[in-house]
A protein has these predicted regions:
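Alpha/beta enzyme core
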Residues: 1-165
Length: 165
């Protein structure tokens, strides 16, 4: 399970962990509640709060902490300050691991491209071409063909035809 938030979710993390369910913390940009997507911990006081929150999440029993859109400098400090692995998304190279949303990595959305997401493929174009091919095949009666269709055995079809005549 992954919970977004800092000290305000610490007791919840502890309770869930104590019941036997592993919990991953999530700090920085909190996409489930964010009103706007912006880089986190650009100011020193915000950075101090985030570092404290990371330590609190670790103390509460989080097995790992996602750091989303946190400045690389603060990510490095947090990673050195906690013993649990940090996983970055848009937070630079200083985390113990990295994650990307597969839609961003594969270029599924043409117009949505977060600055921190490297596109390894442009699937939006391939998807558009595939859908256009499908539509054309349906219009031209090339799909579905025999390969993609189920049929009755010939003798059963003959029996059916006799029953409905």
């Amino acid at each position: 399970m992954k919970l977004e938030g800092g000290k305000e979710v610490a007791k919840i993390i502890k309770a869930i962990k104590d019941s036997g369910v592993p919990v991953m913390g999530h700090l920085g940009l909190l996409p489930q509640t964010a009103e706007k997507y912006s880089v986190q911990a650009k100011k020193s006081e915000d950075a101090v709060n985030l570092i404290q929150d990371a330590k609190i999440l670790e103390e509460s029993g989080a097995f790992s902490i996602v750091l989303e859109m946190v400045t690389s400098d603060v990510t490095e400090i947090i990673t050195k300050s906690v013993k649990v692995p940090t996983i970055g998304i848009g937070s630079g190279i200083n985390c113990d691991g990295q994650v990307l949303v597969v839609h961003d990595m594969l270029g599924i959305f043409e117009k949505i491209k977060p600055k921190f997401a490297k596109r390894y493929l442009n699937l939006s174009e391939e998807i558009r071409n595939a859908v256009n091919s499908y539509v054309n095949d349906v219009k031209e009666k090339r799909f579905p063909d025999k390969e993609h269709t189920f049929s009755m055995e010939k003798d059963e079809l003959e029996k059916l035809e006799k029953k409905i005549v």
